């Protein structure tokens, strides 16, 4: 191939808008360089096989850079951006670098430090009773919550008014931790996607299933998976939820149990134990975990199916104080294999006092 024909082919490519003319960017010293002239007809993919790259980098004496066009600068900037592109959470693409787990206390601290005043206005701390119901509750009902614990109770109810914000890093870490702990995955996942349906949400966006419970439902799931004892319990219940006959939506069931816990708190069923322990959040968490375990035990032993879910939840929610007897359950009730001693909980002491 002659030099003229080669130059014609190169300039034709440039006219198509791909690159500029090479001849316009070469210095006279390069045009006179015999070694380079010999390789003009070699495809770019073959340069590495002929030592061209070494020639271009080693023979720099007398070389003066030509004028760089605006198109060349723009192409260079676009190329440099390639290595700095990061996945967008909303696009559903997950990062290959897994994020750190977030503990329950760290997530709770987030809500203790942000301004929740707009959400707090919506809460109703206790059930408003009138007439005979108010009199009966006053005479025979549980004690009132100590005044020093009312702020902590209000925080729990306020968190239940907060929705899931996928743009909030803390909210995202909570979701990622729940997913990875339940599935055993080592990598983060998209915050929206069909994989959430596998865990028992109704759709691809977990936020749509949190009505009536808000972010408290996710905090309860986080509490369940971040403790070594309750994590094993959660994984057993998750396996039960995937049973070919007794299957049920795991996360959606958890949300409903959070709703029962909120109702128990507002009805002051947990006040006695909260007063005794001088804490509210740990008592609510224990009540949630014990109720979930009780539901799973009922589900397995009574051979319930998804058609029974409404009845089972109604039975649990009719009188939360009846759950005082669910203590001392273990995953042995979910698994025929003997459960380790550390998997046995004593929730009964907490709730037997709550109904007296």
Swiss-Prot record:
InterPro entries: ELMO_dom, ELMO_domain-containing. It is found in: Cell projection, Stereocilium; Cell projection, Kinocilium; Cytoplasm, Cytoskeleton. Expressed in the cochlea and in the organ of Corti, as well as in the supporting cells, including pillar and Dieters' cells (at protein level). GO terms for biological process: auditory receptor cell development; cilium assembly; cytoskeleton organization; gene expression; protein localization; protein transport; sensory perception of sound; stereocilium maintenance. Keywords: Cell projection, Cilium, Cytoplasm, Cytoskeleton, GTPase activation. The keyword Cytoplasm applies. GO terms for cellular component: cilium; cytoskeleton; Golgi apparatus; kinocilium; stereocilium. Residues 170-324 form the ELMO domain. Acts as a GTPase-activating protein (GAP) for ARL2 with low specific activity. This is ELMO domain-containing protein 3. The lineage of its organism: Eukaryota, Metazoa, Chordata, Craniata, Vertebrata.
């Amino acid at each position: 191939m002659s030099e003229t024909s080669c130059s014609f082919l190169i300039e034709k490519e440039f006219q198509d808008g791909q690159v500029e003319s090479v001849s316009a960017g070469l210095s006279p010293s390069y045009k006179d360089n015999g070694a380079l002239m010999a390789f003009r007809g070699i495809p770019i993919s073959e340069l590495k096989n002929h030592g061209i790259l070494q020639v271009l980098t080693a023979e720099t004496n007398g070389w003066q850079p030509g004028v760089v066009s605006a198109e060349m600068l723009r192409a260079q900037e676009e190329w440099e951006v390639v290595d700095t592109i990061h996945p967008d959470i909303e696009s559903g693409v997950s990062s290959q670098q897994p994020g750190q787990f977030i503990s329950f206390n760290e997530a709770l601290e987030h809500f203790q430090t942000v301004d929740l005043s707009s959400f707090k206005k919506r809460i109703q701390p206790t059930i408003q009773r009138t007439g005979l119901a108010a009199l009966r509750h006053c005479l025979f009902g549980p004690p009132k919550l100590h005044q020093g614990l009312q702020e902590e109770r209000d925080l729990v109810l306020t968190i239940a008014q907060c929705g899931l914000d996928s743009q909030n890093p803390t909210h995202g870490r909570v979701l990622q931790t729940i997913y990875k702990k339940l599935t055993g995955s080592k990598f983060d996942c998209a915050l929206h996607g069909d994989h959430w349906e596998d865990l028992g949400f109704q759709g691809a966006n977990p936020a749509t299933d949190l009505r009536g419970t808000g972010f408290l439902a996710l905090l309860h799931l986080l509490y369940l998976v971040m403790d070594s004892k309750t994590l094993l319990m959660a994984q057993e219940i998750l396996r039960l939820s995937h049973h070919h006959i007794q299957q049920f939506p795991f996360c959606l069931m958890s949300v409903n149990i959070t709703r029962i816990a909120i109702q128990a708190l507002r009805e002051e069923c947990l006040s006695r134990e909260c007063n005794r322990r001088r804490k509210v959040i740990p008592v609510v968490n224990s009540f949630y975990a014990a109720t979930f375990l009780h539901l799973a035990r009922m589900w397995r032993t009574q051979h319930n199916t998804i058609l029974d879910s409404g009845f089972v939840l109604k039975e649990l929610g009719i009188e939360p104080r009846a759950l005082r007897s669910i203590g001392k359950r273990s995953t042995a009730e979910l698994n025929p294999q003997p459960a380790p001693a550390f998997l046995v909980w004593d929730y009964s002491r907490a709730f037997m006092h709550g109904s007296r």
